[in-house]
Amino acid sequence: MRKRSRKVKNDLVVLESKEKKVGMWGIFALILIVFGFIIAPLLPGIFDNAHSSGLKFGSYKGQPIYYKKDSKFAKYVNYYSNLYSRLQGNAKNINTDYNAWYLAFMKYVEDVAFLDLVKKYNFYISKEMLNKNLLKSPEYLDSSGNFSSKRYNKASDYQKVKIYDDMVENILFSNVKIFLNSNLIFPDSLFDMIKNMSTVERHISYLSLSYQDFSNKEVISYAEKNLNLFKRLSLASIRFKNMNDARTAHDKLLNKTPFEELAKLYSDDIANFKGVVSLDKYYFDLDLNVEKKEDLNSIFSLREGEFSKPIKIKNKNEYQIYKAFSNVHDFDKNSDRDISSVKNYIETYEPSVIEGYLENKLSDFLGDVKFSSLSQVLEKYQLSLKEEIVNLSYNINVYPNTLKELVEFNNSKSFYDIIFGLKENSWSKPFVANKKVYLFFLNSVKKRSNQLKDEIKNEKILDNFNIANSGLITDFLLNKKDFVNNFNESFFALQNFSQN
């Protein structure tokens, strides 16, 4: 009896223990379910931010702009950014970020529009065509440019799917472009007009003034009106990466530590290890680098041998201490060096001053021509006329351009507007372009022989249209009502100048 009761008791203990284990596992399972279905989906939003899930691309009204990593848009941004970097180099006044982002956005919009067309017209690709193109995918090619099964097998399933999807999309988009081009049907009258345009010529004379024609007298006059900008001082400086180092160095200078010794200790400038190098600096030079105007004025109040307090560099958390190796020199109108520095300043920061002067000079020339012979006025202003032949090859490369020295204007709508807006034996207004100011005179309107016209084939015109209209496809898809206007704007030369 005791054995039975002990067994029952033991069984109850085991059962209770099992129930406890089941209860604990049940609670654990419940926690996992709650975590998996409720909390986990929220975690990316809780812990992730734009820095970890996307790429920063500039800002708008102080708010950062982010876009998804590895997306097609990101690929376009990267492509156009690299392209701008190569083309522009270190060119100033070019917002590379904005231009790259804008072009990437337009390309992305074009892709969306193409995709809609693909769906609307049920475009498809044959398996044979797709496989043929996949075999040429760069990811699968060896160093000789041949398909490599080894490289194919090395690619992950994810990579293969991505390559496949990209290939399908690219081929479909190519087919859409062919579809659009084949549906842009041009009337024969358009081809005839382009052929007739090949015979149109404008024979012009022109003269020009460049920045080099901005006289020293004008340079001196500008400097004397802005004397403060062109004060000059011989300076050496030590750059510090933080304010603490700058203060420590300044205290040492106050305690008679030689400036040269501190330069060797703190400066990253290798030249300072050979001794302090002093350079002549103009007020406008330092105005570009010093953050506060009062600091700038304090530098130009230094006497020879004196040093400044730590001065913050503009747009950086760095500081400089300057030492004067001369007293301040005012602008000297007899100094070629000072005159050259002022002229360089005006060319760089105030080009409108030069252009305004040159425009006024050519306007005076036009005024004198009304009352004197052309040869006399040319001699008075020490100018000479050059000649050019202008034809209508703007934006349409179906026949050769006739421009020579003015070839830089071969795609300038403003230039063509002026030339084809002139009447025979009349002068244009001053025209500013490329650091020069021009005057154009229309000698005559002539027609070339029909030989060139007869050599132009419709197929060549169509080929050029298909190339040139690629930029109009988006407009065609998104703004059909504006297509005609956009077309005429892009093909400026299609205006019927032959009737003028």
From Swiss-Prot:
A Gene Ontology molecular function term of the record: peptidyl-prolyl cis-trans isomerase activity
Keywords, ordered alphabetically: Membrane, Transmembrane, Transmembrane helix
GO cellular component annotations of the record: membrane
Compartmental location: Membrane
Domain of life the protein comes from: Bacteria
Source taxonomy: Bacteria, Pseudomonadati, Spirochaetota, Spirochaetia, Spirochaetales
Transmembrane segment boundaries: 27-47
InterPro entries xrefs: PPIase_dom_sf
Protein known as: Uncharacterized protein BB_0039
Principal place of residence: membrane
Mode of membrane association: Single-pass membrane protein
